């Protein structure tokens, strides 16, 4: 046999073997395989073992440890921060908009962005271990305004969600398709739906999704969870944008349907002081406002001075009016005020008009003896939130007295 031929075969075989070794080494480095252990809070009893792969947020959830994630793991909300002491790899560019350089040095990461490739050591907030999942049943799902529904859920009998006023839950949905033409919307709200032909939209979701919603219920309303959900329709100027996935799903729910929630979560809690409380809301930002105000007056029987300032377009967008009227009649320390930015002729409105931050300033804070001493709790559309914050800062209110819920608007 020709020696050159034998040499060629040998060289080819050697190259194949070298390539095979390189591939195996690369696979061991790049491809998740085998079981790994995640040590948690230096507590051996909290450690979990599971197959490598996926993200840390999902890995923890698979073992019943639910870290808050308002965006459902998309990396946009920054809620799912945990401290990764080892095994998490380098911080990713997608995390840097939510994590400061100081936090990064301390090991803080977004758990939805951390790949689970090897064993790791993490530190989680203790309240995470009180979070649970429930399969709830839809009691009702009624329009309260043109684009807002009140979803009322029954918690399984014998269970309770131990939440605080101002807290939120996460709601889950499996892949689904929602046709807007099937929505049950009262005739009084059809004008805008017809004007923009919103009935034509379809929301098709091909994956499991999770979103966060602030609760409108307060802790004494036992056995139920109540949400105010604004449907995220495509903006009129950009009608090709897909409609909101979770809001479309929630709007399609009917009494008797089953819904999975997890919680409770939250940090938008009332301070335990005697300071005056000023609540400012708009749109679906009503939810945490209702929760807080009902809790203060109905459960705690607070004697703090409390006022609520709510902005809406027209009377059609006002809701819970009778509830707040009754609270005002029963509590000398509580007043509430509505400003309509675009009242309809048929509204015959003789109350405040304009944007709520201007109305609050002109009719109350401008002549307040010490606006900087009040506590301000707000939830509404981003434009409203920004306008209110700018107004409060101009009055000398410190950031620690401005509490904002970003979810409800």
Curated annotation (Swiss-Prot):
It comes from the Bacteria. One of its GO terms (biological process) is sodium ion transport. Signal peptide: none annotated. Its cofactor is [2Fe-2S] cluster; FAD. The chain crosses the membrane at residues 5-25. One of its GO terms (cellular component) is plasma membrane. Disulfide bonds: none annotated. Its EC number is 7.2.1.1. Residues 131-271 form the FAD-binding FR-type domain. Keywords: 2Fe-2S, Cell inner membrane, Cell membrane, FAD, Flavoprotein, Ion transport, Iron, Iron-sulfur, Membrane, Metal-binding, NAD, Sodium, Sodium transport, Translocase, Transmembrane, Transmembrane helix, Transport, Ubiquinone. Binds 1 [2Fe-2S] cluster. InterPro entries: 2Fe-2S_ferredoxin-like_sf, 2Fe-2S_ferredoxin-type, Beta-grasp_dom_sf, Cbr1-like_FAD-bd_dom, FAD-bd_FR_type, FNR_nucleotide-bd, NqrF, OxRdtase_FAD/NAD-bd. It is a single-pass membrane protein. It catalyses: a ubiquinone + n Na(+)(in) + NADH + H(+) = a ubiquinol + n Na(+)(out) + NAD(+). One of its GO terms (molecular function) is electron transfer activity. Residues 34-128 form the 2Fe-2S ferredoxin-type domain. It is found in: Cell inner membrane. [2Fe-2S] cluster binds at residues 71, 77, 80, 112. Composed of six subunits; NqrA, NqrB, NqrC, NqrD, NqrE and NqrF. Belongs to the NqrF family. NQR complex catalyzes the reduction of ubiquinone-1 to ubiquinol by two successive reactions, coupled with the transport of Na(+) ions from the cytoplasm to the periplasm. The first step is catalyzed by NqrF, which accepts electrons from NADH and reduces ubiquinone-1 to ubisemiquinone by a one-electron transfer pathway. This is Na(+)-translocating NADH-quinone reductase subunit F. The gene is nqrF.
């Amino acid at each position: 046999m020709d020696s050159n031929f034998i040499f060629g075969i040998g060289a080819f075989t050697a190259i194949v073997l070298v390539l095979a070794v390189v591939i195996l080494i690369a696979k061991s480095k790049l491809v998740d395989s085998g079981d790994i252990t995640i040590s948690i809070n230096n507590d051996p009893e909290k450690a979990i073992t599971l197959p490598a792969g996926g993200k840390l947020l999902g890995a923890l959830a698979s073992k019943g440890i639910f870290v808050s994630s308002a965006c459902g793991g998309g990396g946009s909300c920054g809620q799912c921060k945990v401290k990764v002491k080892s095994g998490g790899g380098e911080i990713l560019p997608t995390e840097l908009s939510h994590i400061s350089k100081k936090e990064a040095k301390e090991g803080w990461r977004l758990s939805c962005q951390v790949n689970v490739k090897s064993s790791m050591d993490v530190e989680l907030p203790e309240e995470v271990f009180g979070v649970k999942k429930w399969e709830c049943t839809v009691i009702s799902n009624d329009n309260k305004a043109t684009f807002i529904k009140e979803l009322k859920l029954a918690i399984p009998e014998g269970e309770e969600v131990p939440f605080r006023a101002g807290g939120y839950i996460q709601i889950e949905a499996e892949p689904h398709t929602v046709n807007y033409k099937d929505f049950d919307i009262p005739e009084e709200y059809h004008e805008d739906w017809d004007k923009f032909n919103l009935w034509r939209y379809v929301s098709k979701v091909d994956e499991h999704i999770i979103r966060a919603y602030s609760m409108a219920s307060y802790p004494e309303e036992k056995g139920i969870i109540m949400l105010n959900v604004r449907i995220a329709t495509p903006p009129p100027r950009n009608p090709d944008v897909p409609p909101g996935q979770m809001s479309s799903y929630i709007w399609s729910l009917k009494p008797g349907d089953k819904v999975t929630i997890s919680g409770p979560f939250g940090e938008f809690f009332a301070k335990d002081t005697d300071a005056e409380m000023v609540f400012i809301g708009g749109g679906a930002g009503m939810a945490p406002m209702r929760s807080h105000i009902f809790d203060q007056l109905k459960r705690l029987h607070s004697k703090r001075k409390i006022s609520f300032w709510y902005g809406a377009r027209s009377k059609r967008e006002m809701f819970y009016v009778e509830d707040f009227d009754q609270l005002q009649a029963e509590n000398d320390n509580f007043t509430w005020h509505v400003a309509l930015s675009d009242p309809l002729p048929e509204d015959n409105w003789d109350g405040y008009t304009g944007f709520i931050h201007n109305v609050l300033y002109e009719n109350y804070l401008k002549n307040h003896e010490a606006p900087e001493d009040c506590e301000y709790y707000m939830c509404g559309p981003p434009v409203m939130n920004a306008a209110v914050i700018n107004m409060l800062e101009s009055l000398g209110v410190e950031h620690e007295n401005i509490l904002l819920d970003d979810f409800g608007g």
